[in-house]
Structures are given as structure tokens and as C-alpha cells.
Curated annotation (Swiss-Prot):
Pfam families found in the cross-reference section: DS
Highest taxon listed in the record's lineage: Bacteria
Protein name, UniProt field: Deoxyhypusine synthase-like protein
NCBIfam families: PRK00770.1
Enzyme class: transferase
Protein family per UniProt: Belongs to the deoxyhypusine synthase family.
Gene3D superfamilies in the record: Deoxyhypusine synthase (3.40.910.10)
Organism encoding this protein: Nostoc punctiforme (strain ATCC 29133 / PCC 73102)
Length: 390
């Protein structure tokens, strides 16, 4: 008998009064259902504890389906999401709900030529009026003309201000369940966009630039702030978790915080402590969306000692997210809010000081093992530290 046996599969009939926790724990026994169960259990047991900083990346058309309101916002309110990377499209379509616009369930087999003639937009099996886009655009352009937006800023500050205005509209409309942007604003959760020009929000920013707007979204601010968040998670004695919904650019932007710290800044080399992903992308095509945790170890994105705490579930995020949300909301106590948005400047200042200190570090403070081989090595990190021979 193999020594690698796990828990015995002992199926019993599903009852008519089962709750979501028991359903997942007892009946998600194999294949990707088992990976989903393992993720739920890892989150509830280890990740959603007070000492872990949880970053979430969001790609795919999740918010048009309502998951910003139904799943992500409740996770934020319970302290289970500390910071996020999202596509701009997800944040744009999330605003429709906050502004009181209507989206409808359709089907993927409608006549798209006829829909275009009728002024109807389709996102697979979601449909809504073209006027929803126009009115959302008009709202964005109106508030972006305000004085608060007339400067260079990162996308966290930009989305914080957007969320502030959306929240005011929600209050006026009597919206009971806030959208993702408004909730993140209220709970101090910074949301970054890895490619701010790649969405209708970015398109409206670009249009206003033609009119003389001084708003500039600076990606360097985002790269440094997100690296500072990952750095602070460790410097404060805690751990860092990456929860990835889909893949794409948001996934990389979340994971690249670690190479930014060790490869570029030369400050540390560990990687994130926890990595869970829901994806339908294959690893054998070489794309980032399907890249495995073990591959990420080779880049220094994941701590190799924490590989047992990395799980990939190959499934649709629209199936996994509501199940995982229901599981942890029923299983876990709310965590104290970190309100990382309010601490951005302080943690970035700490990162900058440590980087500059390392860059100008006197030779007598260089570790002995490195100093002894200094003459044999020429390659250095940008901060000036020697890169060890491999």
C-alpha cells in the first residue's frame, strides 16, 4: 500500500439541508473540486489570519456579472482583502452598479448585428444598453475635470477618488449594496490597475488630455507602492498572500512585487508566502496566465519553502469566487482592517529609505561572506549589493 495515501474517500448521500462549508469540505473530493476545497481550507486556516497581508488580482469580466457587489465587496468589508490589482475594465463595469444602471441576463447566441442596431451591448450572456456606456463615460469625464484630479498620481489614488464620488452617488440613489470601488474607498483598500490605458476609464482620461487635463497616471508610482506593500508585509513580521482570479497582467503585477524587491532593489529574496489561483489557462503554452507556482519560484516570486501553500484550481472564476466567498464568510471571523491605502506614503517612505541606505552601504557593513568574494564578482543589484555567483 502506498505511503502517499491521503484522506479516505467515503461518499455519503448529500442531505437537503447541507450548508456550503460542509458541502465543500465533505463532497469536493477529487480533481478540481478537491483543489477548490484545499484553497478554501488554506484560506480559512492560514491565510485569513491577522498577520497575513492579502493581495487579490482580478481579470476577466467578473464585475459585469455582479461579483464586485456580491463577492468582492463583502470580502473587503470583512477584512479579507487588503489590496487589489484589477483590470480597468472590471472597475469600469463595476461602476454601472454604483451609478444605478441596469445590466441583464441574456444568452450567448443572440444576433450581434441586431443588437448593434438596437444599441445593445453583449458580454457573452450579459446584455445592457449602449447608453449605460455613454452615461458612465459622462460621469467619469465630469468628475475627472475636478481640481483633485489635476496632477500626476498612481492608480490607487485615482481609484480612491473615483470610489469617493461613486459612493456619494450611491447614497443619493439609496443603493443598499455598494460596488467594489465604493467599498474599497470606504475600507481603505488600495486598488491598482496594471494597464490603466487599457479600458474605457483610461480612454476617457486620454480624451480629457486632448482638452488640456493635467491628470497623468504614473505606472512607476504603482510599481513602487505595490512593492512597498509586499515589503511591509514582511518587515512588520507578517506574511504575504497572492490570491489570483484569472491571470493576465493583474496576476503578474501582483507577483512582480517580489522581483522588484530582490532583482531590482536588492533588498530581500523570499517571495510571497501563499499563492492560490483560479484559472482555465494551460501552463504548456508559456503564457503568464497559466504559469504555475513552481515556475514562479524560479523568478523569486514565490518562497520555495512555501510551495505546499500554493494551489492552482483549473476552473472558471465565476464558479469558484462565490463558493469561496460563501465558505470563508461562514468559516472565518472578520479580520481587523489594515487600511493600507491610508499607510501608502509611510510604507513607501520606508522602502525608499531602506533602498537608498543599501545603495550607499559602507563596505564594512557588507556581510562577511559577500565581502570575501567581492573581488571575484562584478555584477551588482542597482542598490550596489553584489549578486552572488550561482
Amino acid at each position: 500500500m502506498s505511503k502517499q495515501l491521503g484522506q479516505k474517500i467515503a461518499p455519503t448521500p448529500i442531505s437537503n439541508d447541507i450548508n456550503v462549508v460542509d458541502l465543500i469540505d465533505q463532497y469536493f473530493t477529487a480533481y478540481n473540486s478537491a483543489r477548490l476545497r484545499e484553497i478554501c481550507q488554506l484560506l480559512s486556516r492560514d491565510v485569513l489570519t491577522e498577520g497575513v497581508t492579502v493581495g487579490v488580482s482580478l481579470s476577466g469580466a467578473m464585475t459585469p456579472a455582479g461579483f464586485g457587489v456580491s463577492a468582492l465587496a463583502p470580502l473587503i468589508r470583512n477584512g479579507f482583502i487588503d489590496w487589489m490589482i484589477s483590470t480597468g475594465a472590471n472597475l469600469y463595469h463595476d461602476m454601472h452598479y454604483g451609478l444605478g444602471f441596469e445590466l441583464f441576463a441574456g444568452n450567448p447566441f443572440l444576433d450581434d448585428v441586431k443588437l448593434r442596431q438596437e444599441g445593445t451591448i453583449r458580454i457573452y450572456d450579459i446584455i445592457f444598453g449602449y447608453d449605460v456606456l455613454l452615461e458612465t463615460d459622462a460621469f467619469i469625464r465630469k468628475i475627472l475635470q475636478g481640481e483633485a484630479f489635476q496632477k500626476r498620481m498612481g492608480t490607487a489614488e485615482f481609484h480612491y477618488l473615483l470610489g469617493k464620488y461613486v459612493r456619494e452617488v450611491e447614497k443619493q440613489l439609496g443603493v443598499q449594496h455598494s460596488c467594489l470601488l465604493a467599498t474599497a474607498y470606504e475600507y481603505g483598500v488600495p486598488i491598482y490597475t496594471s494597464s490603466p490605458g487599457d479600458s474605457s476609464i483610461g480612454m476617457n482620461v486620454a480624451a480629457l488630455a486632448l482638452e488640456g487635463s493635467q491628470l497623468v497616471l504614473d505606472p512607476s508610482i504603482d510599481v513602487n507602492e505595490t512593492a512597498a506593500i509586499a515589503y511591509n508585509a514582511r518587515e512588520s513580521g507578517g506574511k504575504s498572500a497572492a490570491v489570483i482570479l484569472g491571470g493576465g497582467s493583474p496576476k503578474n503585477f501582483l507577483l512582480q512585487t517580489q522581483p522588484q524587491l530582490h532583482e531590482v532593489l536588492g533588498l530581500e529574496e523570499r517571495g510571497h508566502d501563499y499563492f492560490v489561483q483560479f484559472t482555465d489557462a494551460r501552463p504548456d503554452t508559456g503564457g503568464l496566465s497559466g504559469a504555475t507556482p513552481s515556475e514562479a519560484v524560479s523568478w523569486g516570486k514565490i518562497d520555495p519553502e512555501e510551495l505546499p501553500n500554493t494551489i492552482v484550481c483549473y476552473t472558471d472564476s465565476t464558479i469558484a469566487l462565490p463558493l469561496v466567498t460563501a465558505y470563508v464568510l461562514n468559516k472565518c471571523q472578520p479580520r481587523p482592517l489594515k487600511r493600507i491605502y491610508d499607510k501608502r506614503e509611510a510604507i513607501l517612505d520606508k522602502l525608499q529609505k531602506d533602498y537608498l541606505a543599501a545603495k550607499t552601504q559602507p563596505s564594512d557593513q557588507v556581510p562577511a561572506a559577500v565581502a570575501e568574494s567581492a573581488q571575484k564578482q562584478t555584477a551588482t543589484y542597482p542598490c550596489g549589493r553584489l549578486i552572488p555567483n550561482t
